[in-house]
Structures are given as C-alpha cells and as structure tokens.
Amino acid sequence: MSKVNLFLDSSALFAGIISSTGAARALLLLAESDQITVTLSEQVVAETERAIARKVPQALADLRAAILASKAQIVNDPAPAEVRANLHLISHSADVPILLAAMKANVDYLVTHNRLHFIDDPDVAVKANLRIGTPGTVSLEARSFFVPPYRSDTGF
C-alpha cells in the first residue's frame, strides 16, 4: 500500500510548527516516521518562513528542521500564465497557486486551516478534483491509510 500524500498549505505547516500537540504537528511527525508523505510548494515554504519570522522568529530553525525531518517533497510553483488561466477554481485569487500546486502534485489531500476559501466552498474541491480538509479532519479521514484495522484475538 502506498503512503498517503498530503499537501500542506502555509496555515497547516505554520500550525504544525508552533503547536506541540495539534493535528498538524501529528501529520509532520507521521511524515518524519515515514508513515505518510508531505508535499509543499515553494510558495508554501516562503509564506510560512515569512509568517514565522514575523510572529515567532525563534521557531524559524524548527521550521527548517521539520521540513528536513519530514522529508517533504517541495514542488515548483505554477507559472503566472497557468495561474491566470485557472482563476475560476477558487474565489480568492491568491490561493490559486496553492491549489494548482496541490493538483499538479497529484496528492491525496490538500490540508489547510483556511476554511473560508478552501473548505466552506465545496465547489473548490470539486473543480480541483481534490479532497480538502483541516489537519484534524484529514488525519481522521486518512487514518485508514496509515493505521491498520484493529483485530482482536477475542473477536471484539
């Protein structure tokens, strides 16, 4: 069985760095232990670096260490012409490059905390042909990919 491949946007990656117990952190730890694959885009890395430098600069080293430890695949950003040609995919034009990068990476899920632009509009997932969710919902939905079903010797 192949590992589930999750594309984390900057909100999910940021949460995974600053929280020691949240679902986003758990996803990074699963990637570190080779149970899942994490994919990021160049833009996600740059956005997250800027946000951490601005809000919690002492965590910049943690971000870089987590990206290396998780063996994250970093994909190229889409070309500007490709972004312009796909503005219809999502209402917030700044999110088009993230959506396109996830689509092109052929991931199993796009993981985000950005409910307003990605999750609350179900057409985004349909148009992009992607499953999209928060770290918490994705970790529950994807559980079957990395947790074997429980089998009891007693039949329960």
Regions found by a protein language model. Give the residues of each.
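PIN/NYN-family metal-dependent endoribonuclease catalytic core
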Residues: 8, 20-55
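Domain-scale selection of a single, long terminal region
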Residues: 42, 46-82, 98
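Metal-dependent nucleic-acid phosphoesterase active-site entry motif
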Residues: 1-21
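Acidic, PIN/NYN-like endoribonuclease modules and their adjacent C-terminal/linker elements
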Residues: 108-109, 115-156
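A short acidic, often aromatic-flanked loop/helix-cap motif at beta-alpha or helix-coil junctions
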Residues: 46-47, 80-85, 135-143
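Alpha-helix/helix-capping structural signal
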Residues: 11-12, 43, 116, 137
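Active-site neighborhoods of divalent-metal-dependent phosphate/nucleic-acid chemistry enzymes
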Residues: 73-116, 120-124
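Nucleotide phosphate-binding site architecture
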Residues: 14, 46, 119
